[in-house]
Structures are given as structure tokens and as C-alpha cells.
Amino acid sequence: MSQGVQFNRLMLEMRAMQTDAMARSKPEVQTQEVGAPSFSDMLGQAVNKVHETQQVSSQLASAFEMGQGGVDLTEVMIASQKASVSFQAMTQVRNKLVQAYQDIMQMPV
């Protein structure tokens, strides 16, 4: 009878250790903080920033072409390159998002 009691106690201890280990291995769910921007908000802000950069570049180029004082060719070229780089980066992000969407849609359910 003593062996049966020890066996039961051992099984209870093993189950307790198992549930304890399972509770520790579960990843904690990350919740979005209140007030934190969503992905769509951040993406929209990035697109707006690229648009603003292109507008500034266009305005500087127009001012330089009209011969307005205070507008330097180097400023125009730097603004143009900033607009170009930001647009290329946005295009690459879009391509990666489209590719990720297509990969997800092709996954078997």
C-alpha cells in the first residue's frame, strides 16, 4: 500500500511540474498600448512624409528655375535626391507588403 501512495504522490508532483512548465512556456500576449499608432496610421504618415518631401523638392526646383534669390543649386539637388530616395524606399516597402500578402494568400488553410 505504501508503494501505491508514493506512486500517486509522485504522479501528482509530476503533473504539477508539467502544468507549471506549460504555464511558463506560453508566450505572453503583447497588447497594443492605448494611444500607440496602428500600422495603417504609421504607413499613412510615411506616405504623407514622402509626399511632403517631393513637394519641397518641386518648390525648390521651381524657385531655382525662376531665379529667385536664396535658392542654391546644391539645395535643389539635395532636395531632389532626398525625394528620390524616399520614393524608392516607399516603393520597396510597398513591394514587400504586396509580396507578403501574396505569400499569405497562397498558404494552405
Swiss-Prot record:
Chain segments annotated as coiled-coil in the UniProt record: none
The entry's keywords: Bacterial flagellum
GO biological process annotation, one example: bacterial-type flagellum-dependent cell motility
Location in or out of the cell: Bacterial flagellum basal body
Designated name of the protein: Flagellar hook-basal body complex protein FliE
Molecular functions (GO terms): cytoskeletal motor activity; structural molecule activity
Family in the record: Belongs to the FliE family.
GO cellular component: bacterial-type flagellum basal body
Protein encoded by which gene: fliE
Pfam families: FliE
Organism: Stutzerimonas stutzeri (strain A1501) (Pseudomonas stutzeri)
